[in-house]
Each structure stands twice: as C-alpha cells, then as structure tokens.
Amino acid sequence: MAGTVRTACLLVAMLLGLGCLGQAQPPPPPDATCHQVRSFFQRLQPGLKWVPETPVPGSDLQVCLPKGPTCCSRKMEEKYQLTARLNMEQLLQSASMELKFLIIQNAAVFQEAFEIVVRHAKNYTNAMFKNNYPSLTPQAFEFVGEFFTDVSLYILGSDINVDDMVNELFDSLFPVIYTQMMNPGLPESVLDINECLRGARRDLKVFGSFPKLIMTQVSKSLQVTRIFLQALNLGIEVINTTDHLKFSKDCGRMLTRMWYCSYCQGLMMVKPCGGYCNVVMQGCMAGVVEIDKYWREYILSLEELVNGMYRIYDMENVLLGLFSTIHDSIQYVQKNGGKLTTTIGKLCAHSQQRQYRSAYYPEDLFIDKKVLKVARVEHEETLSSRRRELIQKLKSFISFYSALPGYICSHSPVAENDTLCWNGQELVERYSQKAARNGMKNQFNLHELKMKGPEPVVSQIIDKLKHINQLLRTMSVPKGKVVDKSLDEEGLESGDCGDDEDECIGSSGDGMMKVKNQLRFLAELAYDLDVDDAPGNKQHGNQKDNEITTSHSVGNMPSPLKILISVAIYVACFFSWCTDLPCPCLCCPAAPCGPPT
C-alpha cells in the first residue's frame, strides 16, 4: 500500500515538473523560418543564398549583434551597410536638390545675362559711331569689338587689366579721329604717324578725363560682377562636394544598426526612434555641419555685395551707358580740335621721333566739368532686381547645413513620438536619450561614432568658403559710398539718382537724357538683338536689313518673339526705345536708327 502511494506521488511530481518546465521555456521567435527576412532581402539585394532558412546564433555578426537567434548572416550585414550608405547619399542629395538648382539656375542666368549686356553695349556703341561719326567706321567697330571682347573675358575670370583695356581703346581711336575727322585731307605720305598719335593721346590728354572716368566705372563694376559670378560658382561647388561625400565605416555601421538590424529579428514594420535617428545623423554629419558657420557668412557676405551693386558698381548701368561717355569724349576732342591740331601737327607730322613727350600742353585745353549729366530712368525688372530676388531665396537656406540631420530624419521612416520604436538594439516602448547638437564639439555616447576632424574634402571646401567670404567683404561697397569723390570732381553729377535706383547712366550732348534700361527678365520671352544687327551696322551689308526691320517694340508688335531656352534657365532681353529716345528705330522702322546723339 505504501509503495502504491509513493508511486502515485512520483507520478504527480513528474507531471508538475513538466508543467513548470514548459512554463519556463522562452516564446518561439517571430519568424521561425526567416521567411519574411528572406523575402525582404531578396527585394533589397538579390542573393537568397546568404539568408539562413532558420534562425542561427549569429556569432560572426559585427554590427547587428544578436541577443538570441538571428536571421542575418555576415554577408547580409555587409550588404546592409552598403545599402545604408547609399541611402544616406541619396537622402543628402535630395535635401540639397532645391538649393543646388537655385544656384545653378541663377549662375547660368546671370552669366548669360552679363554676356547679353556686353553685346548690347557693343551694339549701342557701334550705332553711336555709325550715326554720329560715320567717317570713323569700320575702324571704330573693330576697336569697340576688341574692347568688349576683353570685357567678356574679364568677367569670366581672365587676367586682363581694365585700365589697359580702356587705354587701348582710346589709343586706337585717336589716330582714326585725328586722320579722318580733324584732318581728313592729310596726304598719304603723312598717314604713318599712328604710333606718334597713340603716345600723344595720353601725354596731351586729348580726351580729357573721360578715359579715367571710364576706367573707374568699368573697373569697379566689372570687379564686382566677376566676384559675384565666382561666388555663385563656388556655391555650386560647395553643394556638389557635400552631395557626394563618402561616409565613414563607423557611420555606415550606425546607419545599418538603425535602419536594418531590426529585420534580423523579424521586426519588419518597426521604425527607428526619432531621437535615436537625430543622434546617429548628427554623428554621421558632424563634419558637414562644420560648414554651417562659413555657409552663413557666405550668404550674408553675398547679400552685402549685392546691396552695393548699383550706379558705378552695376555693370548693366555702366556698360549700357558707355556709348554716351565715349560720345562725350569725342565731342571734347572736337571742341579742342583747333589747338590739338596745331600742337600735334608740330609733334607728329613728317616725323617718327617721339619729341611730343616733352611737348608743351596748352593750358587753355580744358574739360567741361558739366558735360556729363544724369537723369532718372524708368524702373524695369533688371539684373539688380533679379540679384535681390536670388539673395532672398538664398537666405531661406542660410541654416541648410545645421538643419541637415533633422531634415534627413524627417524624410526617412522614423517613429516621431519615440514610442514603440527601434533603438538600435531592441524594440522599446519609449526612447529617452537626447540628441546631441552643434556638430563635432559634442560627444554622442555612441562608441561606434569616433569623433574625428572633418573629411579632407570638407576642410578644402571650408578653406574656399573662407577665401570667397574675404573677397566678398573686400569688394562690398560700404553703405552710402557709391560714387568716389574723384568722380564728382571730374564732372559726374550723382545727386539725381537715389541709392535704391537701378539705373544711372550718363547723358549725351548738352541736355539731360532719360534712358530706359534695356535689359529685362521675362518668364518665357527672349528678344535679343544680335551684334551684327546693331542699328548702325547697315553699311556692312544690306543683307541684314530684313532682320532689322522685323524687330519691333512691345507696343507695336502683336506678339513678342518667343525663344524657348533650356529648362528652368531663361534669359530675356527686350528693347523698347519708342517713348524715351529720339531714335525710335525698333518701334518705327522708317525712322533713322541708332541711340541718341
């Protein structure tokens, strides 16, 4: 009997023990066959041979360190790291797409627009010679063409001295003026005095102070224009550099842990914690964020430069009014023609000896200090307004680099409220670690992210930003300092134009001249007067007549001539002379053509 009781007790104990053991066993893994992981990995990276069919210990893993059986292999881990870095590069490029397009578009627009301004300035000058000094053509056309070619090259960065450009123009013009206008009847035997005349031009100051005035205006406006273009091109380089950064292995491991290690546990639908994403991104992009300080300074310095680009610091105003100043300089020569002819006749006639260098300069050769006058002009949508619009758009990106980590996290799948999310190791109810800020100066408590200095390419781009910022500050015009005192003393009246006006160019002749700025930006329209189609160039061939007469003003033509240019990059140039200038050639083809005399 006692044996039977003991046997029964043992049976009961065994049953209870089995029950307890059953309760102590851990729950089975979410995907005991790794089927979901295999399906996902196949879509991400073809290669099912690397995915285990059932969970494995994963002792060889280095990033997705398992707390139990895992559906990841070492080869899968490597593929995840590669994919994570590629994803990061794509997110970074997506973040900068709008900014990059903004700068590229405007750099192309302004470069083309500056070329259009130069081309029109050349046309105006040629037309002025044709209508006022026909005896000087075509020699004058050649000299004017060479001058404006040098202007274009200078804007694009060529190492050309502006003073030399202007001196060469007047050195070349004076022999033609002297032999064709002042002494048209000179015999052939004395026409070989060009070198003597070129030298006499400077020593006798036959054009008065107009060459110096042009040097000052052209030099200041072109220097600012060139640095403006250089700054835009550097902005493109900065964006391109950060767009194509190669992230470190440490960063790749952290990105993999954040985006893909949850898959190894079969947690396919779990999102990374938002706070965890911020920490990882600030660590990965610590070097990039170091650009922020210099990027902010770049935009603010560019704004300061743009704010000073008016009057003599605006190449649009200076070049489009250059024909008027050249016209005035020739009038000055004519006004003093008698005395100049006498003096130069003694120095250069029948002689190649350079005795003129010690010649007496008559004191009564003078410059009329009120020859140049300035008038208000009608406001148009000019290069100046376009520049200001660009600056306003750029300022919306002034925090671009400091905001990059947050931007990328906001554009990738994360749990924004940090609840039921992946913290890099496991699924948690709430993530509590605070994201670090301010680039590399903070430690992240993430041993995987080793704090190093910026990548060499980032250091190089920072150095370039420092350099361009220094140039921008150097070239920026202090507020209120627009016209040099020396210019006022030489006859440039500056009182007629306010600081906010876009157009201030010289007059021609004795009276005030109201000039409408010729260059406008239109959304989809482009009207461009070709160099050879300048109103004064008809003597070069009647074959251009049809092209000239088909050009109309806005007021007279039913619909403007439309020229579609490359996507999102447009340059529009439009002429409307009818109401303001004596020569309404574009509005009234029958009228004499050319700018005012």
From Swiss-Prot:
GO terms for molecular function: peptidyl-dipeptidase inhibitor activity. Glycans are attached at residues 123, 240, 417, 494, 508. Residues 1-24 form the signal peptide. It is a lipid-anchor; GPI-anchor. Disulfide bonds join 34-71, 64-261, 72-264, 196-348, 251-284, 273-421, 277-409. The keyword Transmembrane helix does not apply. InterPro entries: Glypican, Glypican_CS. Keywords: Cell membrane, Disulfide bond, Glycoprotein, GPI-anchor, Heparan sulfate, Lipoprotein, Membrane, Phosphoprotein, Protease inhibitor, Proteoglycan, Pyrrolidone carboxylic acid, Signal. The keyword Lipoprotein applies. The modification Phosphoserine is found at residue 351. It holds the Pfam family Glypican. Residues 533-553 are annotated as: Disordered. It is found in: Cell membrane. The modification Pyrrolidone carboxylic acid is found at residue 25. O-glycosylated; contains heparan sulfate and/or chondroitin sulfate. Cleaved intracellularly by a furin-like convertase to generate 2 subunits, alpha and beta, which remain associated through disulfide bonds and are associated with the cell surface via the GPI-anchor. This processing is essential for its role in inhibition of hedgehog signaling. A second proteolytic event may result in cleavage of the protein on the cell surface, separating it from the GPI-anchor and leading to its shedding from the cell surface. GO terms for cellular component: cell surface; lysosome; plasma membrane; side of membrane. GO terms for biological process: animal organ morphogenesis; anterior/posterior axis specification; body morphogenesis; bone mineralization; branching involved in ureteric bud morphogenesis; canonical Wnt signaling pathway; cell migration; cell migration involved in gastrulation. Cell surface proteoglycan. Negatively regulates the hedgehog signaling pathway when attached via the GPI-anchor to the cell surface by competing with the hedgehog receptor PTC1 for binding to hedgehog proteins. Binding to the hedgehog protein SHH triggers internalization of the complex by endocytosis and its subsequent lysosomal degradation. Positively regulates the canonical Wnt signaling pathway by binding to the Wnt receptor Frizzled and stimulating the binding of the Frizzled receptor to Wnt ligands. Positively regulates the non-canonical Wnt signaling pathway. Heterodimer; disulfide-linked. Cleavage by a furin-like convertase results in production of alpha and beta chains which form a disulfide-linked heterodimer. Interacts with DPP4. Interacts with FGF2. Interacts with WNT5A. Also interacts with WNT3A and WNT7B. Interacts with hedgehog protein SHH; the heparan sulfate chains are not required for the interaction. Also interacts with hedgehog protein IHH. Interacts with CD81. Interacts with Wnt receptors FZD4, FZD7 and FZD8; the heparan sulfate chains are required for the interaction. Belongs to the glypican family. This is Glypican-3. It comes from Rattus norvegicus (Rat). The lineage of its organism: Eukaryota, Metazoa, Chordata, Craniata, Vertebrata.
